[in-house]
A protein has these predicted regions:
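A beta-strand signature from Gram-negative outer-membrane beta-barrel systems
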Residues: 139-193, 765
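Gram-negative outer-membrane beta-barrel transporters
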Residues: 27, 370, 427-429, 435, ...
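Transmembrane beta-barrel wall of Gram-negative outer-membrane proteins
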Residues: 198-228, 238-279, 297-312, 424-429, ...
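Periplasmic N-terminal accessory/gating domains of Gram-negative outer-membrane beta-barrel systems
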Residues: 50-102, 107-109, 117-142, 154-160
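Signature of Gram-negative outer-membrane beta-barrel scaffolds
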Residues: 372-489, 515-517
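Outer-membrane beta-barrel signature, preferentially recognizing the C-terminal barrel domain
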Residues: 290-315, 353, 408, 412-414, ...
């Protein structure tokens, strides 16, 4: 481990942490503070690591209308994506949209996304449709959500904790669906909520309805949401976003039943669907000319059934609580694209990605003297399939005897078994300060195998031959963790932690296929892939250093090996003999280090005349480099590392709760991705040459948002905001780091983020 990076970022994080509280002073002891409620973190709820919660109120206040905008003010979390019509590493039929979340420089499938513990399907790599031009990009993303359906979003930054059944190298984003108990309490047995919003960035209208009723013994909830919108506007001066219109519907029904004094049952059924029609041009890889005029009809849906039992036995001394959850999830993605290609004629392509998953999680908790012992088991079984159809005619029957395109990957079946044990031991020091030791371990076994290989058979490769190429893959991992925490004061804690993490290969990497039927070259997965692993170190501070200040700060260093990428060989491939093969391989190693800080200041705690005034400040910085196993390669900066970002905000909330207003400024440095020739390396014994590609530099930017609300009555609130108030023209780095500097000016302008936009909403709550 290279400790200079941890030392450097630790100094930055701790320096900022110690400096900020000096701007605040506590009130004198003789001052009265009768109306203030102080929320203290009970020792049993303190956890190490950077854990962020975005509440339903945060989503409303910050204009979080979709998968991406809920993260707009997070310093090291973002939602990269692509737009319809982009050409770099994209086919005409790959859909636009968000691909997933990026946390601390790792993105897409290296970040877990789940809803109530049920993981969402993986993002589908584009190499299956465009070959090596699509390395590192995705054709089907992970956006199966409607932000109105959730009470909160829990985020773990960095390697996931041992208690998280959905382990991942980069972190996790967990959406918690609405429940009746969130809105009901003793004395309130009914709830009605209605929300109506308009967002000018994509001219979308939203209507949401939440109804709940019941008591402590039996309650239920019904949530409905409808959205209608168009394409997200860009801010280019020469080309507008290509036209599209979309609609989505979501419904959730749930009930809670206190079946006995010991058992609480919760059941939830939720369904989401979205349809979209798009018209766009597809440009070539370098963004210099249009290759086809396309029309796409897209559909996706997700159905989930969850049953959860919380058992608190009174007659079993070694169990305080046992929580057991069962889930069933089905997802379907369907894209039909009519393509008018300039050289290949007119044809239609239909792509699908369908999954079916069963999930089981159980967690036991026991408090014994100064220990909190947690243990759990989990299991997941899933099937996926990728039906594919094209009417395209082969342009060269000798090279492509079965046409230019075939099924992108084999259908597969996968199951995973896991368990964890964690002991949280507290030691009291001087009757006030606590020291905590938290050892833990997670074990994971995963097995994946291909199915229905006969569906991939072509003229020169039958199902039996494919069975030799695509076989089962399995692995077992032991992932230890160790954390130390110390209470600087009862509400402010320092921590140091180590975690081992792993990311097992997915079906896209194991069984992907491109041109496997051709006599030219082939790009395929590898059934013998090893698991990606990491060692993660983090030092941080979190809590309330002084009255009126909430602060979370961390510095981290992560080291990775066995990153999966593609390597070129000339070798025999089943069914066609010797030729060029690009095959998935555990090719790269990498490291990432950085620091982040988030803080909030209640200025009214120190200056009574400023009661209602608050401020926030957040900053995130990270750096990361990777190196392949190729001769002559060197460490170069990872293109998934976002440039430094800071958020500064000032807010006023009327003490009489009549209105509030906030101004928030977001600043991000510019950055230019560093090109590499790893994807075109001949692997013939000569050193890896430098790349001649030159990427477009993404300029730094600063944008200002102005938001506010008015409580018209106790139950009716009008809220809204103006975003990018100064109409700044800018590009999002993580979504556009592979644009070429030589691309057409119009093409580059197509990728600009929205200019000045506004949102307006009405909330009714009874």
């Amino acid at each position: 481990m290279n400790f200079k990076y941890l030392k450097k970022t630790s100094s930055l994080a701790i320096g900022l942490t110690l400096a900020l509280p000096t701007f605040a002073t506590d009130k004198h002891n003789d001052e009265k503070d009768i109306d203030t409620i102080t929320v203290t973190a009970h020792e049993a709820t303190k956890n190490p690591g950077m854990n962020t919660e975005i509440s339903e109120q945060d989503i409303r206040r910050d204009g979080g209308t979709n998968f991406g905008t809920i993260m707009r003010y997070q310093p090291l979390i973002s939602a990269p994506g692509s737009i319809s019509g982009s050409g770099s590493g994209k086919s005409s039929w790959d859909r636009g949209g968000f691909t997933g979340y990026n946390i601390r420089g790792l993105d897409a499938n290296r970040v877990s996304i789940d809803i109530d513990g049920m993981p969402l399907p993986i993002a589908q790599g584009r190499v299956n449709s465009v070959g090596r031009a699509g390395f590192g990009s995705y054709g089907i993303g992970r956006d199966y959500i409607d932000t109105y359906m959730y009470n909160k979003v829990d985020i773990q930054s960095g390697a996931t904790s041992v208690s998280n059944a959905n382990n991942a190298l980069g972190g996790s984003v967990s959406f918690q669906t609405k429940s009746a108990s969130y809105y009901l309490y003793p004395g309130k047995t009914t709830y009605f909520g209605y929300q109506n919003n308009y967002d000018s960035s994509d001219r979308s209208f939203h209507q949401g309805l939440t109804m709940a009723g019941g008591d402590d013994y039996l309650n239920g909830i019904l949530v409905l949401s409808r959205r209608d919108g168009q394409q997200t506007r860009n801010n280019g001066d020469s080309i507008s976003s290509y036209p599209e219109n979309w609609h989505s519907n979501s419904i959730l029904a749930g009930f809670g039943w206190q079946m006995t004094e010991e058992h609480l049952i919760n059941t939830t059924v939720d369904y989401n669907n979205k349809t979209k029609n798009s018209h766009y041009d597809t440009w070539d890889k370098y963004g210099k000319k249009v290759e086809s005029l396309d029309h796409q009809r897209s559909k996706n849906n997700r159905f989930n059934l969850a049953i959860k039992d919380q058992w608190k036995p009174t007659a079993i001394s070694w169990i305080d609580s046992l929580t057991t959850q069962l889930n069933y999830q089905r997802t379907n993605v369907y894209d039909s694209t009519d393509i008018r290609h300039t050289t290949k004629g007119n044809f239609n392509t239909q792509t699908n990605y369908n999954t079916k998953t069963y999930n089981f999680i159980t967690t036991l908790v026991k408090n014994y003297e100064n220990q909190k012992i947690s243990a759990g088991l989990n299991g997941k079984w899933s099937e996926d399939e990728s039906p594919f159809f094209t009417s395209a005619q082969s342009q060269n029957g000798r090279i492509f005897p079965d046409g230019d395109y075939t099924k992108p990957q084999a259908d597969s079946r996968s199951y995973q078994l896991g368990g964890f044990l964690e002991d949280r031991i507290s030691f009291n020091i001087k009757d006030s300060n606590n020291f905590y030791l938290v050892p833990g371990v997670r074990v994971i076994y995963q097995n994946t195998k291909p199915r229905n290989l006969e569906n991939m058979a072509v003229t020169n490769i039958n199902g039996s031959q494919l069975g030799k190429q695509y076989s089962s893959n399995s692995d077992f991992q032991v992932l230890p963790s160790m954390s130390f925490m110390y209470d600087i004061n009862p509400d402010f804690t320092a921590y140091l932690q180590y975690k081992r993490s792993a990311q097992m290969p997915n079906q896209n990497q194991l069984y992907g296929s491109y041109l496997a039927h051709s006599n030219m070259y082939v790009l395929v997965g590898d059934s013998n892939l090893n698991t990606e692993t990491s060692d993660n170190f983090e030092l941080g501070l979190k809590g309330h250093p002084v009255s009126g200040v909430t602060l979370t700060s961390s510095a981290f260093y992560n080291k990775y090996k066995n990153f999966i990428a593609y390597t070129r060989y000339r070798k025999n491939f089943v069914g066609t003999g010797n030729r060029i093969v690009y095959q998935a391989e555990n090719r790269d190693k990498a490291y990432i280090y950085g620091a982040e800080l988030s803080s909030e200041f209640n200025i009214g705690k120190w200056v009574e005349s400023a009661n209602g005034l608050s401020a926030k400040f957040a900053i995130g910085y990270n750096q990361g480099k990777s190196k392949s196993s190729y001769l002559g390669d060197k460490y170069i900066e990872m293109d998934s590392i976002a440039p430094m970002k800071s958020v500064v905000g000032l807010a006023w909330d009327d003490p009489n709760k009549f209105y509030g207003v906030a101004v928030t400024a977001t600043f991000q440095k510019g950055k230019k991705a560093e090109a590499t020739s790893r994807e075109s390396y001949g692997n013939d014994g000569r050193p890896l040459p430098n790349s001649k590609d030159d990427y477009f530099r993404i300029a730094g930017h600063g944008i200002i948002d102005l938001t506010g609300y008015i409580n018209i009555t106790k139950n009716v609130k009008l809220n809204g905001g103006v975003y990018n108030l100064t109409d700044q023209k800018y590009w999002d780095y993580l979504s556009n780091n592979k644009l070429y500097s030589t691309s057409d000016h119009k093409y580059l302008n197509m990728f600009t983020a929205p200019g000045r936009t506004f949102q307006l909403g009405l909330d009714v709550d009874f």
